Amino acid sequence: RHFLSSVSRILRHQVNFNEITLPERIVKVDSFPMGIDYNKFEAAAQNHFKNTEEQRTELQRRLDHHSNETPEAKLILSIDRLDYTKGIANRIRAFEYFLDNHPEFIEKVRLVMLAVPSRSNVPQYQRLKREIDELVGRINGKFSTVSWTPIWYFYRSMPFENLIDLYTSCDIALLTPIRDGMN
């Protein structure tokens, strides 16, 4: 509303409902609220907790196993598009720094990372993926024990029900954008 009013008053363009008439074209304007559909996620989470053992996904069974085997351990969740603005490599390095400086947390905390493929044909993004793969491999090799891997790394999209599994099972959400205005 305010944008269209400014276009009309300041720029002196004709505004008709949600359209701006310019000499060479008509621009359609609309608002798109940011964020998630909270009600959808809340309902899915509530339904999730009602699932019987047979209704649980394979991912949820694995998360449950982790929780049952190590009830004091914490899961840190990180979900982002694979994008240089998201700070994923820095986040992984910070996790390594944490484990280096606080070895008492080895086997007591795990980073669950979901990197959703994005622009996978762009060389810069291919380099970023390779860097992240190498960091995860190095850290898992450095800190893993027979019964524990510090980072569970998934490079793919996940079905909504698996996202709900992650959101409802993890203890901490970790978002570390470098340059991002939508979080």
What does each model-identified segment do?
Residues 1-183:
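Catalytic cores of carbohydrate-active enzymes across secretory and cytosolic contexts
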